[in-house]
């Protein structure tokens, strides 16, 4: 059991650094037996159900359930010139290639600049969790690429990091890449998507940021209770995330994925960093959610999101 416990290594985004993927694979790969794989899968699923925001469990489940999907995605990537270049050269979108400062140096409204703004807005790092339990170096790279594209999808679709946006994007990743955990994550995410959110329509500056656990069915933000109580009803914004996800966002992302001209995993998105994000969206034939949904999904500093 000591060996099994050691497998549940707490991941940090900073552990995926360096420019050579082979070196990263050798550094991070953990060989496990079939029995350990089953045990780790069950444990990760239980932990994931208890806390769907636990990135360690999510990463484990993805790696242990995606082998066939990764092979299909690898075949798809090899079917296009850009995809073959990606598979051959194994480029990384991480801190060994780009800093936030580098991204912010791209022109206004470029994909790279908007990506940097997204990371800055939510205080995110560019590095992603390393792949540990995929025993094929080639497939481990495909999963690494999949993870590194995630925040670029947020940027391209203009989706924030609320539970409702993450559920929407997980479903997209399942439809677009076939990764099983996309469907599992979207399903689990529906259970922790709040039924109700209450916040002031105008976000005021002098607030105290507090964490609101995302599985609370009704989110009334504690740091602005007095402020909300002093507002007239017309100045309060009441949101219904769970209903919107089921009735609006899921149908929208399903249609959006079906009408895309190209698969994003077959594209050297780095080549688009200096170009306008609108050109990238037009090339893929994607667009942000409809205007009436953007109060749920818009990318902006939202202390009460």
Swiss-Prot record:
InterPro entries: Coq4, Coq4_euk. GO terms for biological process: ubiquinone biosynthetic process. Pfam families: Coq4. GO terms for cellular component: extrinsic component of mitochondrial inner membrane. This protein may be expected to contain an N-terminal transit peptide but none has been predicted. Lyase that catalyzes the C1-decarboxylation of 4-hydroxy-3-methoxy-5-(all-trans-polyprenyl)benzoic acid into 2-methoxy-6-(all-trans-polyprenyl)phenol during ubiquinone biosynthesis. This is Ubiquinone biosynthesis protein COQ4 homolog, mitochondrial.
